[in-house]
Amino acid sequence: EELNVLIGSDAVEDADIKEAVKLNTLMLLHEKYGITERDFTRAEIEVVPAHKARDVGFDRSMVGGYGHDDRVDAYPALMAEIETKDPVHTTVCVLTDKEEIGSDGVTGMQSMYVFHFMQLLCRAAGQDDILAFQNSVCLSADVTAAYDPSWANAFEPQNGTYAGRGVAFFKYTGSRGKSSASDASAELVGDITDRKSVV
């Protein structure tokens, strides 16, 4: 989060120009994309590594790539929703944004868009939205940290997750103890693990 983005180092060949590198970079941006300096005052810019995902390790057993933590969750969730045919109960897949900053903003889960969508869905089906929420189950997909012996104090070796040992299943989330915590009931955990023979 404290990295600086490198966007250019060549300067315009004019000794009288004070910000020669900046001018050269702006000229290139305008030539290639039609971007001017004024656009930066109102633009939403996301800078990400451009390389593709690649194998990691001598045995090529791991994957490294920008955004892979989100992709490995989003893709299976979306495909599960697409491939679900004639479900007994209505199924919904939510792919959302802004998780890294506390899920704030109009596209984060702290906003009301999912709640409003579910209300509209219930109304369209002629169902009571309060009862629908009370009878709903939600699973949240994310990655977790595998045990790292370099930072052993941050893990519980006998109750933690390890790389290469399958899917991790957590009944709670949160940070700094109980801050922003959500804890699934024992009944829900039991139902999911028994139904799918997870444990």
Task: Tell me the role of every PLM-derived stretch.
Residues 1-199:
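N-terminal hydrophobic/helix-forming segments and targeting peptides
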